């Protein structure tokens, strides 16, 4: 089967998490800023779209070349065997971006690439004077220029991979599903341990934890634009979806709690969990974080609390951080992970983090504060085990 260069785009700071996911699928990869690059066949395109929890999109590299003039961009784009990617009736919108490049006008670059593809497809079909009917499946082309290096790709995902298909409602400013999955994967949580999100909002972090806990592919409940691509075909997509079903561990018991101070958000979170088919796995409750108590041990708490960025909110938010620190202080077997842009978090919480990791929540620069618990003792095997 033909091999392709595939690009999993990733938010800044999450590339290493995406790379681990790619390797877990069985593909060697290399990490670059904002992307993870790997080689794979058409089945790999299906698998990556279905399984990668933290990537934004899966792109197929068509070509990469130097381009300092519009003529150069046109001729090198036209030289590509476009018929091997786009069928006769394929719809191919062209988007673009240019960074630190001679060809700085993105609209002009898009127009030239579009024209070059049209001319090549006409030439390859023997219909040089005919109009190209773009009535079929979509093959979105991107021309990306960085320091005069042109990269042409096809977007195989369609809607961004953060769109899982379970969000019925979202309330205020929800965390992206891809970032929520990364927050879970950056912890020491395993499915046999309790998991808590005390700022659940619309339930995203808890839902992503449940998907991870039962090894349910994040793309199981949605469609992808490349499902209609002729050169991949329905059979490969069916094979990849069958793998998804076979690898899911629906019998894995989970202990997941999610709470929020706002009863309306708790209701939205419940509805989203039901839509994901996980309603029975997550226990939701309206509660302030300061009231959290538990007799369970060796659990993991992950939260995306309010940041206090709005005028007049900072003092109240930092008081809440203080109360949270007091509530969590007795939980010496629990690990705590909090994402916030508030630089006073550690002082308000009352303890220095074991580790901090810089992440972006959308365009907001944040730190992921990690408080590691004491080491969980290994379970002793009995002679008859």
From Swiss-Prot:
Q: Give GO MF terms, alphabetically.
A: RNA binding; rRNA (guanine-N2-)-methyltransferase activity; rRNA (guanine-N7-)-methyltransferase activity
Q: Boundaries of each THUMP domain copy?
A: 44-156
Q: What is its EC number?
A: 2.1.1.-
- Return any one Pfam family short name: RlmL_1st
Which keywords annotate this record?
A: Methyltransferase, Transferase
Q: Which domain of life is it from?
A: Bacteria
Xref: Gene3D superfamilies: 3.30.2130.30, Vaccinia Virus protein VP39
Subunit note: Interacts with the RNA polymerase core.
Q: Which PANTHER family match?
A: RIBOSOMAL RNA LARGE SUBUNIT METHYLTRANSFERASE K/L, RIBOSOMAL RNA LARGE SUBUNIT METHYLTRANSFERASE K_L
Could you say which protein family the record assigns here? Belongs to the methyltransferase superfamily.
Protein name (record): Putative RNA methyltransferase YpsC
What organism is listed for this UniProt entry? Bacillus subtilis (strain 168)
Its lineage reads:
Bacteria, Bacillati, Bacillota, Bacilli, Bacillales
- Gene for this protein? ypsC
